[in-house]
């Protein structure tokens, strides 16, 4: 049996800056609960961003230590405009867990 090889890094045509990776914080009732109890923060992120990109961006922009990043790709919803049916855009969400000594104070 051969050993399992780690995945090859994905080559992107564009390199994203930290302010391009984190699009906006997701401030919801559930998000505020996570921030106060579990020290986890949610952000809407660029669709091409990886977990490592998100970790580096949060650490660079907020001067905190990130323990874990979880990502989700959310599907857009069907919406109706007059007599036509369309869809909202798909988007990507990241939930970032911080070290217990660090906080992001805008939540």
Curated annotation (Swiss-Prot):
Nucleotidyltransferase is among the record's keywords: no
Keyword Disulfide bond among record annotations: no
GO cellular component: cytosolic large ribosomal subunit
Any single GO BP term: translation
Key words, A-Z: Ribonucleoprotein, Ribosomal protein, RNA-binding, rRNA-binding
Coiled-coil ranges from the UniProt annotation: none
Pfam families, alphabetized: Ribosomal_L23
Role this protein plays: One of the early assembly proteins it binds 23S rRNA. One of the proteins that surrounds the polypeptide exit tunnel on the outside of the ribosome. Forms the main docking site for trigger factor binding to the ribosome.
Family of this protein: Belongs to the universal ribosomal protein uL23 family.
Quaternary structure note: Part of the 50S ribosomal subunit. Contacts protein L29, and trigger factor when it is bound to the ribosome.
Protein name in the entry: Large ribosomal subunit protein uL23
Species assigned in the record: Rhodopirellula baltica (strain DSM 10527 / NCIMB 13988 / SH1)
């Amino acid at each position: 049996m051969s050993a399992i090889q780690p995945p090859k890094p994905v080559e992107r045509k564009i390199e994203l800056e930290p302010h391009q990776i984190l699009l906006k914080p997701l401030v919801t009732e559930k998000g505020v609960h996570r921030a106060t109890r579990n020290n986890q923060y949610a952000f809407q992120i660029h669709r091409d961003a990886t977990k490592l990109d998100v970790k580096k961006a949060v650490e660079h922009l907020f001067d905190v230590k990130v323990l874990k990043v979880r990502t989700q790709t959310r599907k857009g919803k069907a919406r109706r405009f007059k007599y036509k049916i369309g869809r909202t855009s798909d988007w990507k969400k990241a939930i970032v867990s911080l070290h217990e000594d660090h906080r992001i104070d805008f939540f």
